[in-house]
Amino acid sequence: MRQGTINNYIKLSKNFGGVRKCYEGKPSIAVGGFMCDPALMPTYPNAMAAGTLVYADESARTIVPIYTFKVKSVDTNKKTVTVEKFETGTIAKVGMKLIVVGNDLSDAATNVATVSAIDSSAEDVDVLSVDAVTGISEDAVLAEAGSDNKIKAVPNGLTYCDNAIDPDAYAIDIDYIWNCMEKPVLERRMPPLTASLKKALRDNECYFRFSNRK
């Protein structure tokens, strides 16, 4: 840490749990780095928050972030969806396809919202203009969808810290965690999860003790 900044509030951290400190303990990090396509990263200077869901391919040594969004409000007339934003910044991008996370991640969504514009002027929320708001309601959890209208990937881990990519970088490697049982994972300090997403983590041999306290 730079001298004289111990009492500062920062926008991202490479320490365990990121700037929001979503891990009380020191989780188990998977061995080795996993390469992430820079196009999948938030636009600089925004960052991917600690606790972001990921799918890591052990064979290919690649990693795909799975972005989730907590809906704060929906304007059906303007076709806008207001979503929670962390200190790490905006993670949505124009062209991103979003679906409501259902009870079964293997099901394709009937309704898909494609982001056409983003108002990121507020500190704590982003307002997403979309082509349709059908099926989206307050407090719903949205996730980025793939071409098959299912969640982009089934998660098998969480990021251990905040991650940002420099505008001059041509590649980035990201480490992920799969185990944090000794102390709780504070889910209210991380991107939103659903029961189905937690089940997917368990099914993929991830071991987390989630806590709903702040």
For every predicted segment, state its role.
Residues M1-K214:
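Surface-exposed, low-hydrophobicity beta-strand/loop segments enriched in small/polar/acidic residues
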